[in-house]
Amino acid sequence: GSPSSNFVAAAALAARVCGLDCDLLVSGNRALLPADVPLTLGLAGGCGANLCFTGADREELDGLVDEHADRLRAEGRRPYPVPRGGATPVGALGFAAAVPELAAQLAGLDDAVVVVPTGSGASLAGFLAGRAAAGATWRTYGVSVSRPAPRIRAEILALAGRCAALLHGPAVRDADLNLVDAVGPGFGRLTDADLRHVRLALDSEGILVDPTYGAKALTAVLDLVAAGERAPIVLWHGGGVPAALTLLAGGAA
């Protein structure tokens, strides 16, 4: 993933718990990062992960992961290659498994709106598969933070369908997904409105919102309210506390 990827840190933590070695292929060059590396990478390194800076763009990482796995096999090891963001049907199951908890919290609120940030598409795909399995009727808005919405939509729906098949649940329909294009100035780059909303969440509710996913999803929520949405809105917080702390530290400096 990228240096600010939530998945980079999560993968390192999971590997440590499972007693697995973890090689993380990171886009970009280490020399171009600030002296204090993003906390996401610091957390991953602190968990014992091997950080491999590729010098490549994010879009090239999946191919590089496969090449790295081939080299490990040639050394007699048994790698389990995972694409960026954990975007596989198995990777999406985590979000699908979380839907029943949300359903319990939203009992009686069938008209609720759920807003989920998405990068690789795995989280949103899992949510859609879990929503279908639960028979929920909430309207779902995905907020695409890294890829143009028309491009990522088909990938999300295909991944959701494959995840639904693993659950032996009903199919995910195209109409189940409303997708907001929030790439803006780029992945992890915020508009002035996004920055204001980060501060608003912190000052009014004490909520840390990261710059990569949460800030853009929060902007989408406030846009819905401004457009007249009156149903209960749930913002699914995508994590990213290390990146949020990095952003706040930079603002303080």
Regions picked out by a protein language model, each given a short descriptive name:
Residues 29-107, 178-191, 196-197:
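Small/polar-residue-rich loop-to-helix segments that shape phosphate-bearing ligand pockets
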Residues 1-12, 18-27, 111-120, 143:
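A short, small-residue-rich loop immediately preceding and capping a beta-strand
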Residues 9-56, 150-162:
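Active-site-proximal loop->helix
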Residues 173-230:
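Active-site-adjacent helical/loop segments in soluble small-molecule enzymes
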Residues 4-11, 120-127, 214-220, 243-244:
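Short glycine/serine/threonine-rich phosphate/pyrophosphate-binding segments
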Residues 9-21, 128-135, 220-228:
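Alpha-helix C-terminal capping segments
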Residues 92-177, 240-253:
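Glycine-rich phosphate/pyrophosphate-binding loop at beta-loop-alpha junctions
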